[in-house]
């Protein structure tokens, strides 16, 4: 059975930031592709996020990058309500089996949803601030530090939807900072492996 350490104070989150950065550097093939695509888009002389739906399209690219991660994090609430009471699901997670997020966590009929720990609008603003023809290294740095997807309860999401990244937050800081302010706790040692399907 999984022991459930929970990160719920600033000292633990600060030390966790180092581990976060290490894990974030381990990108998969889809994420590497999205770095190339987003760099190419930003380098186009005619690119303008204000034209048509391009702002939405651009933020969707960022969301696809983040959602392409192999593992998603889990909130304390989601673990206690959805995973812990379901021995079959718990065994699948313990066995590191790839899961269909829609089957267990995503959809209008589910009490949980998939939440981006750093809002795509924050990441988009940072990327756009790089100007025309940004370096791939600068784009990669922002994307690598743009957080992860967390499985959270809808009740927890109501707290998060009212929150922004903390004042003076930077991409060099832990992407858990918004969760600290909202009081939403993440289970430290649980990672849910995603199958090939991305839900947005």
Where are these regions (language model features)?
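Nuclease and nuclease-like effector domains acting on nucleic acids or nucleotide cofactors
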Residues: 1-109, 162-169, 173-199
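Amphipathic alpha-helical interaction surfaces
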Residues: 95, 120-124, 155-159
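Histidine-centered nuclease catalytic patch
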Residues: 104-142
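Extracellular structured ligand-interaction cores
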Residues: 109-114, 146-150, 176
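Short linker/helix segments within small regulatory modules
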Residues: 131-147, 168-170, 179
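Alpha-helix boundary/interfacial micro-motifs
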Residues: 133, 199-200
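Short Cys/His-centered divalent metal-binding micro-motifs
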Residues: 143-169
